[in-house]
């Protein structure tokens, strides 16, 4: 379950409309957030009766109800058989560091397997989203592997410590296209590499000069699995990364923007 939008409980109380909560069972197996294709299997929707909250209901009580009725746990989740091929394709977008050695962007996908080019550990993914070790190492769930990747990155929030100390470069991307998605038809505005510093995002190796102060960012988000959106007051920019994890970039930008504002 993803985090709730801040203030949703206050919005419910303000509007005064009945609340219908729902749970989607087995969707995490049929269409995981990293998957490039839907697997074959059953998805089950459960809806609760409408609940009306009074204006005087404490917000924390409303939030507790919504969280309880929409959160799936091992105790209340229902699973059905799922089949599919190439299960690991797209997985390194969310597991962007090796669960064993912590190497950033060191994992390579191969159909339903991932392997680390640094420590040579390997895993095979099954339809229950379990990463099973192929070499006597530790098996773990995708969720556990994702949390390990985030924890590893959060130790420094840097791609290369030495380069950061020498040049102030926090992150530098693979070659990419930068799009302006503010209108219905997106427009390419630059090609090159995206860099992140403590104060800005900027394009290098590009014929077009482009930079965006972190202070101008209103929102950074990942949409539809691999769309990294950089939203300002009047523009939406999207760096289209062919292979690199956009979730890693999301976490980095969020961290350094917050650090700059603190």
Stretches with model-predicted labels:
Residues 1-178, 196, 219-224, 228-262:
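Non-catalytic C-terminal accessory region of glycerolipid acyltransferases
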Residues 175-195, 202:
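Non-catalytic terminal regions of proteins
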Residues 194-227:
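Phosphoinositide-dependent membrane-docking surfaces
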Residues 187, 208-211, 234-241:
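Short, surface-exposed beta-strand/loop "edge" segments at domain boundaries and coil↔beta transitions
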């Amino acid at each position: 379950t993803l985090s709730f939008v801040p203030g949703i409980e206050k919005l419910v109380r303000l509007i005064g409309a009945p609340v219908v909560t729902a749970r989607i069972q087995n969707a995490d197996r049929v269409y995981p957030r990293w998957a490039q294709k839907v697997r074959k299997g059953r998805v089950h929707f459960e809806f609760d009766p409408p609940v009306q909250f009074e204006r005087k209901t404490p917000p924390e009580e409303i939030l507790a109800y919504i969280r309880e009725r929409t959160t799936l746990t091992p105790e209340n989740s229902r699973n059905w058989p799922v089949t599919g091929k190439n299960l690991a394709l797209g997985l390194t977008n969310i597991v962007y560091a090796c669960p064993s050695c912590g190497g950033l962007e060191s994992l390579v996908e191969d159909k339903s397997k991932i392997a680390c080019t640094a420590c040579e550990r390997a895993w095979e993914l099954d339809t229950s989203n379990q990463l099973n070790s192929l070499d006597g190492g530790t098996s773990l769930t995708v969720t556990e592997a994702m949390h390990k990747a985030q924890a590893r990155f959060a130790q420094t929030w840097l791609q290369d410590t030495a380069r950061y100390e020498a040049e102030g470069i926090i992150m530098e991307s693979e070659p990419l296209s930068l799009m302006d998605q503010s209108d219905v038809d997106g427009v390419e505005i630059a090609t090159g590499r995206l860099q992140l510093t403590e104060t800005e995002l900027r394009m290098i190796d590009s014929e077009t000069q482009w930079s965006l102060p972190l202070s101008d960012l209103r929102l950074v988000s990942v949409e539809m699995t691999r769309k990294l959106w950089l939203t300002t007051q009047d523009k939406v920019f999207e760096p289209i990364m062919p292979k690199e994890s956009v979730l890693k970039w999301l976490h980095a930008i969020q961290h350094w923007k917050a650090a700059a504002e603190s």
